Amino acid sequence: MEPSSPQDEGLRKKQPKKPVPEILPRPPRALFCLTLENPLRKACISIVEWKPFETIILLTIFANCVALAVYLPMPEDDNNSLNLGLEKLEYFFLIVFSIEAAMKIIAYGFLFHQDAYLRSGWNVLDFTIVFLGVFTVILEQVNVIQSHTAPMSSKGAGLDVKALRAFRVLRPLRLVSGVPSLQVVLNSIFKAMLPLFHIALLVLFMVIIYAIIGLELFKGKMHKTCYFIGTDIVATVENEEPSPCARTGSGRRCTINGSECRGGWPGPNHGITHFDNFGFSMLTVYQCITMEGWTDVLYWVNDAIGNEWPWIYFVTLILLGSFFILNLVLGVLSGEFTKEREKAKSRGTFQKLREKQQLDEDLRGYMSWITQGEVMDVEDFREGKLSLDEGGSDTESLYEIAGLNKIIQFIRHWRQWNRIFRWKCHDIVKSKVFYWLVILIVALNTLSIASEHHNQPLWLTRLQDIANRVLLSLFTTEMLMKMYGLGLRQYFMSIFNRFDCFVVCSGILEILLVESGAMTPLGISVLRCIRLLRIFKITKYWTSLSNLVASLLNSIRSIASLLLLLFLFIVIFALLGMQLFGGRYDFEDTEVRRSNFDNFPQALISVFQVLTGEDWTSMMYNGIMAYGGPSYPGMLVCIYFIILFVCGNYILLNVFLAIAVDNLAEAESLTSAQKAKAEEKKRRKMSKGLPDKSEEEKSTMAKKLEQKPKGEGIPTTAKLKIDEFESNVNEVKDPYPSADFPGDDEEDEPEIPLSPRPRPLAELQLKEKAVPIPEASSFFIFSPTNKIRVLCHRIVNATWFTNFILLFILLSSAALAAEDPIRADSMRNQILKHFDIGFTSVFTVEIVLKMTTYGAFLHKGSFCRNYFNMLDLLVVAVSLISMGLESSAISVVKILRVLRVLRPLRAINRAKGLKHVVQCMFVAISTIGNIVLVTTLLQFMFACIGVQLFKGKFFRCTDLSKMTEEECRGYYYVYKDGDPMQIELRHREWVHSDFHFDNVLSAMMSLFTVSTFEGWPQLLYKAIDSNAEDVGPIYNNRVEMAIFFIIYIILIAFFMMNIFVGFVIVTFQEQGETEYKNCELDKNQRQCVQYALKARPLRCYIPKNPYQYQVWYIVTSSYFEYLMFALIMLNTICLGMQHYNQSEQMNHISDILNVAFTIIFTLEMILKLMAFKARGYFGDPWNVFDFLIVIGSIIDVILSEIDTFLASSGGLYCLGGGCGNVDPDESARISSAFFRLFRVMRLIKLLSRAEGVRTLLWTFIKSFQALPYVALLIVMLFFIYAVIGMQMFGKIALVDGTQINRNNNFQTFPQAVLLLFRCATGEAWQEILLACSYGKLCDPESDYAPGEEYTCGTNFAYYYFISFYMLCAFLVINLFVAVIMDNFDYLTRDWSILGPHHLDEFKAIWAEYDPEAKGRIKHLDVVTLLRRIQPPLGFGKFCPHRVACKRLVGMNMPLNSDGTVTFNATLFALVRTALKIKTEGNFEQANEELRAIIKKIWKRTSMKLLDQVIPPIGDDEVTVGKFYATFLIQEHFRKFMKRQEEYYGYRPKKDIVQIQAGLRTIEEEAAPEICRTVSGDLAAEEELERAMVEAAMEEGIFRRTGGLFGQVDNFLERTNSLPPVMANQRPLQFAEIEMEEMESPVFLEDFPQDPRTNPLARANTNNANANVAYGNSNHSNSHVFSSVHYEREFPEETETPATRGRALGQPCRVLGPHSKPCVEMLKGLLTQRAMPRGQAPPAPCQCPRVESSMPEDRKSSTPGSLHEETPHSRSTRENTSRCSAPATALLIQKALVRGGLGTLAADANFIMATGQALADACQMEPEEVEIMATELLKGREAPEGMASSLGCLNLGSSLGSLDQHQGSQETLIPPRL
């Protein structure tokens, strides 16, 4: 191929067009002196932008990290030669980095211009590190010089350098700037910082509140413990940590002989954990929120003050702090990821569009190039073939000559046979039989590996060895057959085959190495376990599973960048930890701290441990003790651990989950069409039983992969490819496809009520309809019409009966909980037994009744055909049997008694909401099946590897110096706490670890506890110390074993468990949506509509009394708010300043301050009560809260005063006497402790002030509302498990130092629930499990037989605790998360989309216009109201008036007769418009659909409200839309008139042509615009708007005038023409009214009005001034705009009958050429509707009379007696004038119909108003117009006239948006905003 081919040339030409990577634009000068031409700068630029330079720097950074890691920190700042060498190497790194920074600064400039060096965040980081490094070196030199002069100071100076040296650890962060995908992850996290900051505030706030409560309640309580009398030795039993005690009350007593309870103990954890002052209190609370070690704190507090109520404090803390607030972090992160991904997507789309054209060009070049290449390739190929063949023929002739024909034939035959064999082989390999055969071998392989265990017999070992070889040969055969059959290229195309090949080769290698003795059998046998991955071969025909596996593999790849970030993070903190704590975890006692920072691998493990959150607190305590204990420098250490924990555990680990949830959710949004397609394909495949993926499917998959968005961001990396994953997981949902595919039901059975397809909640709210009696007879004797059966049916379906049964279920459950588990024959149990009989009989009767009604089980619809009924039957049967079997076979009875616990489950069938949640759970479980399977397989694989590595190695002798069981005999000495004086003699025992890897089951159990993060460090260190089978441990023997655990934790615990959790969450969210699947509203729309329907206006109370008004003014001012805010903050500070052992003076001051604050807050309450009166005050929940707090505080003050007064006799506690032995410190005002809480509660008031936090709270409460059934389910779960626990484990003795002790046991129901709650938070649950397993000591009071005291507990504990933990951790807690994520999506959502949290603003602003909360305001105020509310809800203040009005017409609320609009209708219209709910298509139909939807979802909506927000069809009402339509037509007429004037230069003659032109204006301009507005198509509308404004500028139509809305386009142009000269004159008749002034609702009431007038018909003073000047009260403008007021300039102006008469719209003739009748338009629109016929229409407001500018004769010619006419005569005259224009009406109807406004054409009032406007525009009298219209009509054929008049009635459908019924146009389509 020639290089200079034309294609090549073309390609080269096109090449430059490719987008070049952007180079930083270089500033012309750097450092003020170096220009771009400067050689130094040129050199620097070329070096810095040279690609290898970056690589060199990255390598240097990497080398620096290695150097930092190799450094060995030593105690007491010792050093060795390695460390000294590394110190010297440090200088080299520093020089390299300094040079790099200097060159970059020279190249790019330092700071002052864009793109300078320091303008990039990463460079700032680099620069800081380099600068600190240089600074450290300088300081060190100074130190050296100083140490020569003054040796004493060296020690002190050296410390500063050490602190600065710690900054070196940030250098690895520079790797981030080199790896783009890392920056993406970080960017996503940074983006989430703002909402995370809100959450951090909320957490901080909670911590502060709880810390202060803790301080008030528990300070000084932790300092007493049990000492041996007369010594300072703490008295504890074996294995027990010292804990607080109490001399009185119900705290812990000292039971050990010779011990007493006394003070002087520093407290638990060396005095770090306590509530003595605010700082320690906060630390303790924070530790509890992290759910690590919180039970210890609870138990210590229980020991100190009794266990009656401290649990309330801790449980609420965990629920609010851990489950709720910390899960918000997850909500925020996943929201951010979704947003980032969407951004990347849209960015990608945009770029695609931009590059498309260019790509096309490039493509043409490339394509021609490639095709050319291919052609040449093929030609080459052919030539090669030919030459071969030719060669062949040559040789052939030679051979022929030699007579060697036979060989040739043999070769040919061989090729032929080879081909046949290959085909055969190919068919075999692809056949199903072969596949199942391979699966069988894999199963055998799995079996042989899984059968390995510790101490296995020799024959088994041999068998396994043989099996291993045989199976290996089989696998090799399979591999070779595949290679032969498929050909190498095709074979290696499949990833699975490559993997297979690797496994087989490693197996062969292993056998060779072991045989040759080059390697111990152990090390490589791990490879054998990798063979287990072959299990995944099963997935070949299980498509859903194989896709899940494929997507998981892909997602691992995409999470790689996150793992890299995690690794960097761990490295940095490990290095920092080494700098801070290296060599310091070296304490007086003999115990070795395993989690330390003494070398790099160990530091990595320690940081990783903190990251998983396991036992991080003990590491923090050690760190604090290393720096001198709980005092000044030591406490700073906790900052390191807290930052590490927060960033690592909350943020980075939640990012895992966020990515998982985000991708799952993203995949959920695959269109239902796609899902249906997949489902259909799957069904076809299943029916045909096709084995493999079709080619088409493969190609679609490949395409899908290519289509991944190319934007930046985790969004793409983390795309997890869960698209396929999800769609296929959806395919798995076989058991209940109906629950996942919209409109897809099971194949075999139609909808059955038992399928866990949740019933829509809407149906659940109302009572279900009774199930009819089935046709068949019941018990073969009762026919369907039998009276007894009918009666039973009536009873069973009665509400009272259901409630009665529910009550009995509750009572029987309570009875179960009340049983005494220890003393079986106690009095309590006897009484309960009788009750039990009663309950059982009631339930039996219920079941008999139901069976009589529905039949037993033979026919459809019978009792036993429903799962829930079967459950009922089981429970009742169990109760009956256990009552029968009183004494016999004890164990059977025991099990049956346990089964009674299922009773509460019967409530599920009765409470519909609960049933829905339960069904939801079933669906979730069925959906998760695949993930469980994959996780289990992985778990199994790791378990097998664990067995290979650790079987039989977890034994040890209690005396660590002995290594084997033989040596481990006899006794040995122990020095207690390293004290040579305390010597103990102990017996040597050979013990086995509780969790071990001796066989696969134990290994899986051990790994399961690791995956829950509980107790894994202990297991890890046992594994690291493990030596050989049956030999004791050696310290840090194989540190590399940590890799096994860390990989397991990352893969299973971080990744699989999070995918699992994500799945549960997504499933629950989906299930929540299925309820509303067919209601066509999405979640946000539902919430907004619900808000609009349920909201009520706020009462804005403004007192009338002047003094009260003054108070009200003060109380509602912002200064008052700030003052209270400051006072609450002060109060908080005062509360936080208290501490243990504070001086008397301090006590006195704090008491005085407390009284002072109480008085201030009481004053605030009194002032507010005065201002708002009781009704207004208690209307606000915050005020109620304030009130309670004030009352509580007052009681608190009174109590503490009494207490102080009685202090001499021992306080309140001792009023009844008998307090001689009370410790005054302990009586610490327990009675008033409760009321002291009120002091702290004031803090919560702060929440009502901060906006962001308030929104958080709002949602918080929302999510609580969403939780009731979920909470009920959790309560049920806890109840059932607690009762089972009491029955099973209640008899275990309480032994201090074990897990079942005085604080943690199953002996009473509350204790059992608390213990389960502890397990749910994961606090050492595996140790409780072990403490409950078989062989534990029995409680002395229980009824065990002699010699059986060690028979309590049962191995059922394993199933019990694991099932409970899984249910809790994966389902229940995730329900919390799901609910939270559902409710908190607003935190990260797009704020431009209207959401329910925006709607509060509407209520607040509405209240200003409607302070009495009547729910109505004048429709004129709506425009101002909506312009005050910012988008997305309102229009915002910059919305042009014309657009605002168009939007109003789109919203089109119904008007009441008094001209007001209602609150709910306006809000509903706003929501509907903003969210485009049913705004397209035929409008009446849309309205009806929306009404139906609302009735379906919100069944309890009153019809009155529904008619208010969506008026039913045929409702003849005036709407805002009418006004606008008329207004628009007038405006077009005005423009038309203006055009004519400008065209002719004078007023044209009155003729037919003009009227025709006017009608054309309706058809061609006005009608389409109204259509558009009405159909909500404002996108085109706003374009048009701009065009019109431009045209108007040219025409000079729109003049600016200061109206109500500030600068507004003046549409209200004069309608009568003036001589051209006067066209631009503007008499200065009215003042401008600014927007701000007008905003006050009071302002609108400032204008005097005629008391008789209707507010709606206000004077339309909004005419052009010239009209007023010429005495022309023109009312032809739309009433919507008639609210523009002008201030009167003429104080002498008075109202005369004449002006009023003129305003009434009578045809008052005025002399003069331009005169015209002032028929008021609003009459046509409103009066007829608003008033019953025959009543007088109300008079509109008067027009201000203008004196001076009107000629006398005109004035006098106005008949003065008009106003004396009777109402009747007025209305009749008006009616006659209205009905006198049939011809005009017909013409206008035609025009409207042609314009597509058939519905308006049917509205007589509208036609009349338009006729009037037409007359005005043409400047004719109506009579003149009528004459010309008649002529026009005559000119047309009659049939056409008929047709068009019919058309106006029939063509209503041509405009679906307007109402067909006459005049009802209230339901215009809201425009799109």
Swiss-Prot record:
- Topological domains on the Cytoplasmic side lie at 1-51, 107-115, 180-196, 331-432, 484-494, 543-561, 654-799, 851-866, 912-930, 1061-1118, 1171-1180, 1251-1268, 1382-1873
Annotated Acidic residues bias: 742-751
UniProt-annotated binding residues for Ca(2+): E292, E614, E1014
Q: Residues in intramembrane regions? A: 280-301, 602-623, 1001-1021, 1312-1330
Q: Which residues lie on this side of the membrane: Extracellular?
A: 71-85, 137-160, 219-279, 302-309, 452-462, 515-523, 582-601, 624-633, 819-830, 886-892, 951-1000, 1022-1038, 1141-1148, 1201-1231, 1290-1311, 1331-1356
Q: What is the effect of changing L1367V?
A: In CMYO18; uncertain significance; patient myotubes show decreased depolarization-induced release of sequestered calcium ion into cytosol compared to control
- UniProt protein name: Voltage-dependent L-type calcium channel subunit alpha-1S
Which taxonomic lineage is given here? Answer: Eukaryota, Metazoa, Chordata, Craniata, Vertebrata
